[in-house]
From Swiss-Prot:
Catalytic activity: XMP + L-glutamine + ATP + H2O = GMP + L-glutamate + AMP + diphosphate + 2 H(+)
Residues annotated for ATP binding in this entry: S235, G236, G237, V238, D239, S240, S241
Active site positions, chain numbering: C86 (nucleophile), H181, E183
HAMAP family with a match to the protein in the record: GMP_synthase
Name of the gene encoding the protein in the UniProt record: guaA
UniProt GO MF annotations: ATP binding; GMP synthase activity
EC number from the UniProt entry: 6.3.5.2
Occurrences of domain Glutamine amidotransferase type-1 (ranges): 9-207
This protein's name: GMP synthase [glutamine-hydrolyzing]
Function: Catalyzes the synthesis of GMP from XMP.
NCBIfam families documented for this protein: guaA_Cterm (TIGR00884), guaA_Nterm (TIGR00888), PRK00074.1 (NF000848)
Length: 525
C-alpha cells in the first residue's frame, strides 16, 4: 500500500472571493491536501471529510446584510483550528459575538499592520520593526466592512490606523482571523502565516508531493480498472498528456490513446505528439487524419460559437468511431482537473460557481457502457505540470502557452479554410520562434497569431499585390481573468513582421494587438 497522502487535510469554505482557489493552491504548495467547498455545507459533510483545520475564504458580500453567507455553526464546534480570511474573519467575528460595520473608507491595496500582541500565527514573522521595536507586516487589504468589536474571548493581535482589528485570535480554541489576504504575493509574509497555520497549528505533515501523488494515482487507477482496457483522447495538451503518462505507468498496453489531427493544430504538432508519445514513450496510439472532415464540417460557417460546437461535435463523432473499432474497452479516461470540478459544483443555495461546458469528450455511443477514469481530478494545473515533469515529460511542452481546445478554428477569424490555417501556422511559428530567441517567451503569459480574413495592398518588387493580414497578440496576466497587452520591444516586433512578410507567401501586413482584458478578451473569438 502507498502512504495515505490524504490523511492530513484542510477544508476551505468558499464565500466567493476571486482569490479562493489561490488559497487552496498555497495550501497544496505547503505539501498538504485540501478541498474547496461552498460555504453552505452541512455538519454531516464536515464530519465525513474530517479536516485537520478549516479556512474561511474572503468574499464579495457584506456580513451586515440580511441573508449574507455564514459559516455552518459546526465549524466553531468541531474542535479544529479555524482561520478566517477577510470576509471569513468578519463572519467569524459576527457569529461568535463580535460586531461588524460597513466602513465609509474602503481599504484596498498595500497596508502596514502593527503586531500589538503575541500570537502563534505570527510569532517571529515580520517585515520590519516600529521605532519601539514592534513587528510590522506588509499586507494586501481588500475590504469595505470592518470588525469593530471582537468576540469576548479573542484578543487583538495586530491593527492599522484604519483597521483596529487587522488580526484577531483565540489561542485556546485556535481560532484566527485576518482582515488582509495572506494568499496573494503582495502580502510578503503571507505564505509563512499559512504555513504556520497549516503545518504548526493544525499539525499537518507535508505528504502531498509530486512523487507521492503519482504513486497514489497509479495505485488508484489499478484498483479502479484492474485488467480492463482504457481509451483516452490524447490532444497533446498538458492535461491529456499527463493523464496518458499516469495511465501508461499504471496499466501499460491496456491503454489506447486516440490522437485526432483535426487540421487545426500548430505547425508540426501532430508529428511531435506521435514522436514523443509513440516513439519515445512507447504508448499505444491510434492516429486519425481528420483534417478534411473537420474542414468540410466548418465550410461556410463564420460564427465563433457555432465553429466551436462543430469542432466539438466532429471530434466526438471521430472519437466514437475509433472507440467502437476497439474490442472490450471498459473505461474512458479524461484529463478533468480540480478547477473543472469546482466550477461544475453547484451550491445548494444557488450562490454557485458558473458551470462551464468543457472541451472534453462527451456523449459516447449509448451501446458503449463505459466507466470514467479521471486521475487528475484532485489537481490544480500547476500540480499537473509538476507531476508531468516527475513523469519525464519535457519542460517546454508542459509550460507551453495555453492553446484553445478548438485550436486554429478560433484563431482564423470567420470561415476556416485550409489555405488560411496553413498561412497562420507558419506565421505563428515564426512569432513563437523569435520570442524564444529573444528570451521573451517565458516573460509573456500567452502569445499567438490571428488570421484576419481581409486583404490589404502591399508592394513586392515593382508590383502591387493584395494579400492577407495577421495580428500578433501577446499578453501578461496572473490569472487570465484580466490581462495587459505585452510591451514587446519595437525592434523585436519589426523583426517578426519582416520575417512573416518575407517568408510566408500570402501575407502582406502584420499588426500588433494592443487591447487589454477587459474590455477585449485574450482570444479574438
Amino acid at each position: 500500500m502507498t502512504e495515505n497522502i490524504h490523511k492530513h487535510r484542510i477544508l476551505i469554505l468558499d464565500f466567493g472571493s476571486q482569490y479562493t482557489q489561490l488559497v487552496a493552491r498555497r495550501v497544496r504548495e505547503l505539501g498538504v491536501y485540501c478541498e474547496l467547498w461552498a460555504w453552505d455545507v452541512t455538519e454531516a459533510q464536515i464530519r465525513e471529510f474530517n479536516p485537520s483545520g478549516i479556512i474561511l475564504s474572503g468574499g464579495p458580500e457584506s456580513t451586515t446584510e440580511e441573508n449574507s453567507p455564514r459559516a455552518p455553526q459546526y465549524v466553531f464546534e468541531a474542535g479544529v483550528p479555524v482561520f478566517g480570511v477577510c470576509y471569513g474573519m468578519q463572519t467569524m467575528a459576527m457569529q461568535l459575538g463580535g460586531h461588524v460595520e460597513g466602513s465609509n473608507e474602503r481599504e484596498f491595496g498595500y497596508a502596514q499592520v502593527e503586531v500589538v500582541n503575541d500570537s502563534a500565527l505570527v510569532r517571529g514573522i515580520e517585515d520590519s520593526l516600529t521605532a519601539d521595536g514592534k513587528p510590522l507586516l506588509d499586507v494586501w487589504m481588500s475590504h469595505g466592512d470592518k470588525v469593530t468589536a471582537i468576540p469576548a474571548d479573542f484578543v487583538t493581535v495586530a491593527s492599522t490606523d484604519n483597521c483596529p482589528f487587522a488580526i484577531m485570535a483565540n489561542e485556546e480554541k485556535r481560532f484566527y482571523g485576518v482582515q488582509f489576504h495572506p494568499e496573494v504575493t503582495h502580502t510578503r509574509q503571507g505564505m509563512r502565516m499559512l504555513e504556520r497555520f497549516v503545518r504548526d497549528i493544525c499539525q499537518c505533515e507535508a505528504l502531498w508531493t509530486p512523487a507521492k501523488i503519482i504513486d497514489d494515482a497509479v495505485e488508484r487507477i489499478r484498483q479502479q480498472v484492474g485488467d480492463d482496457k482504457v481509451i483516452l483522447g490524447l490532444s497533446g495538451g498538458v492535461d491529456s498528456s499527463v493523464t496518458a503518462m499516469l495511465l501508461h505507468r499504471a496499466i501499460g498496453k491496456n491503454l489506447t490513446c486516440v490522437f485526432v489531427d483535426n487540421g487545426l493544430l500548430r505547425l508540426n504538432e501532430a508529428q511531435q505528439v506521435m514522436e514523443m508519445f509513440g516513439d519515445h514513450f512507447g504508448l499505444n496510439i491510434v492516429h486519425v487524419e481528420g483534417e478534411q472532415r473537420f474542414l468540410d464540417a466548418l465550410a461556410g460557417e463564420s460564427d465563433p460559437e457555432a465553429k466551436r460546437k462543430i469542432i466539438g461535435r466532429v471530434f466526438v463523432e471521430v472519437f466514437d468511431e475509433e472507440a467502437l473499432k476497439l474490442d472490450d474497452v471498459k473505461w474512458l479516461a479524461q484529463g478533468t482537473i480540480y478547477p473543472d470540478v469546482i466550477e461544475s459544483a453547484a451550491s445548494a443555495t444557488g450562490k454557485a460557481h458558473v458551470i462551464k461546458s468543457h472541451h472534453n469528450v462527451g456523449g459516447l455511443p449509448k451501446e458503449m457502457k463505459m466507466g470514467l477514469v479521471e486521475p487528475l481530478r484532485e489537481l490544480f494545473k500547476d500540480e499537473v505540470r509538476k507531476i508531468g515533469l516527475e513523469l519525464g515529460l519535457p519542460y517546454d511542452m508542459l509550460y507551453r502557452h495555453p492553446f484553445p481546445g478548438p485550436g486554429l478554428g478560433v484563431r482564423v477569424l470567420g470561415e476556416v479554410k485550409k489555405e488560411y490555417c496553413d498561412l497562420l501556422r507558419r506565421a505563428d511559428a515564426i512569432f513563437i520562434e523569435e520570442l524564444h530567441k529573444a528570451d521573451l517567451y517565458n516573460k509573456v503569459s500567452q502569445a499567438f497569431t490571428v488570421f484576419l480574413p481581409v486583404r490589404s495592398v502591399g508592394v513586392m518588387g515593382d508590383g502591387r499585390k493584395y494579400d492577407w493580414v495577421v495580428s500578433l497578440r501577446a499578453v501578461e496576466t496572473i490569472d487570465f481573468m484580466t490581462a495587459h497587452w505585452a510591451h514587446l520591444p519595437y525592434d523585436f516586433l519589426g523583426r517578426v513582421s519582416n520575417r512573416i512578410i518575407n517568408e510566408v507567401n500570402g501575407i502582406s501586413r502584420v499588426v500588433y494587438d494592443i487591447s487589454g482584458k477587459p474590455p477585449a478578451t485574450i482570444e479574438w473569438e
